[in-house]
């Protein structure tokens, strides 16, 4: 008996590492020290920082992975993994520095795993951060053969005096909603349930233009890092930011609001993507559940003073992203308490 007969293929692991090497190294920033294969990734802090704060985040892709593995969407979930982490840490105004990934699988498929890492590398390049290392765990008997799970870890940096933490938010500020690219990576346990209930398959289409349903669902999560960097470099006065993930607008907008303020959102200010109408009609999903599960077309929010709206809109346009003024900030009715979101289904 040997390790391979026990279910762990060391040679396949080596082939996997050799295939991903170029993709990984292509993400490296000038601050990276050394290459792939060491026990730990090394990186210098960018030069010129006076009082740097490190910002960390970790996340996964959830059960979107099952849909991706059933339909060959390995590359896309690699991008998703980066986006879920990077989009969180940039809400503080931080610049992503490096990313680490963890993959666990029942039996290593070098082709599929390498495709995932190539997606991760694409996400890192699109976010300006280095893929500094990772771990691939082959765990026969623990995970089914051909199935894998992913986790990502991101570290970013921001000057302490430039930290965006919501303390500057004031009544009268505007909420700018940035378009999502689709469902992103939240709510897929409900999505999969609806797909099963509706008998949907790879041939199913939706909407007036008959878009392929599965392909649309597997669209990668939008990366907002470059946009935020552009906004900050052009001097856009950003008072707060929110990444709209699980819980939707009602549960994520309040996370950046200080005591005594609330958000007033106008749902008619943007057009809800057709995918949500399909899910609601085929799954009989209550309106409130839609709002508390999905992003409904808004993947990221900026809170800016009224005079900053046009600046932010131009920056979004320059990055090819659609944006709408979707609401405003007001004093909460009691004058205290940490933010709520009004204007949405209760």
Swiss-Prot record:
The protein, known as: Phosphoribosylformylglycinamidine cyclo-ligase
Coiled coil: none
Family assignment from sequence similarity: Belongs to the AIR synthase family.
InterPro entries recorded: PurM-like_C_dom (IPR010918), PurM-like_C_sf (IPR036676), PurM-like_N (IPR016188), PurM-like_N_sf (IPR036921), PurM_cligase (IPR004733)
Species lineage: Bacteria, Bacillati, Cyanobacteriota, Cyanophyceae, Synechococcales
Predominant subcellular localization, coarse grouping: cytoplasm
Keywords, comma-separated and alphabetical: ATP-binding, Cytoplasm, Ligase, Nucleotide-binding, Purine biosynthesis
Gene3D superfamilies noted in UniProt: PurM-like C-terminal domain (3.90.650.10), PurM-like, N-terminal domain (3.30.1330.10)
Single biological process term from Gene Ontology: 'de novo' IMP biosynthetic process
CC per GO annotation: cytosol
Organism of this sequence: Synechococcus sp. (strain CC9311)
């Amino acid at each position: 008996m040997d390790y391979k007969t026990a279910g762990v293929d060391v040679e396949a692991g080596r082939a996997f590492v050799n295939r991903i090497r170029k993709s990984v190294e292509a993400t490296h920033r000038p601050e990276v020290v050394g290459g792939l294969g060491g026990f730990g990734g090394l990186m210098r802090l960018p030069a010129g920082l006076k009082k740097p704060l490190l910002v960390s985040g970790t996340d996964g892709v959830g059960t979107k992975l099952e849909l991706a593995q059933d339909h060959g969407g390995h590359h896309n979930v690699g991008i998703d993994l980066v986006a879920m982490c990077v989009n969180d840490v940039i809400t503080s105004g931080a610049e992503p520095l490096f990313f680490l990934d963890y993959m666990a699988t029942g039996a290593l498929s070098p082709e599929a795993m390498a495709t995932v890492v190539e997606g991760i590398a694409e996400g890192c390049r699109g976010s300006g951060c280095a893929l500094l290392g990772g771990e691939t765990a082959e765990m026969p008997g623990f995970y089914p053969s051909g199935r894998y799970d992913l986790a990502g870890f991101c570290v970013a940096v921001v000057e302490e005096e430039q930290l965006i933490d919501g303390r500057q938010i004031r009544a009268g500020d505007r909420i700018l909603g940035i378009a999502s690219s689709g469902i992103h990576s939240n709510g897929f346990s409900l999505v999969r349930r609806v797909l099963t209930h509706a008998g949907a398959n790879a041939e199913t289409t939706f909407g007036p233009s008959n878009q392929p349903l599965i392909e649309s669902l597997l669209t990668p999560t939008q990366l907002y890092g470059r946009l935020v960097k552009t906004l900050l470099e052009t001097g856009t006065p950003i008072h707060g930011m929110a990444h709209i993930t699980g819980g939707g607008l009602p549960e994520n907008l309040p996370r950046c609001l200080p005591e005594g303020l609330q958000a007033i959102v106008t749902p008619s200010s943007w057009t809800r993507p057709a995918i949500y109408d399909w899910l609601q009609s085929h799954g009989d999903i209550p309106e409130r559940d839609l709002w508390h599960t999905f992003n409904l077309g808004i993947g990221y929010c900026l809170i800016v003073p009224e005079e900053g709206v046009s600046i932010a809109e131009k920056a979004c346009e320059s990055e090819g992203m659609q944006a709408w003024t979707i609401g405003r900030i007001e004093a909460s009715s009691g004058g205290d308490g940490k933010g709520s979101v009004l204007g949405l289904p209760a």
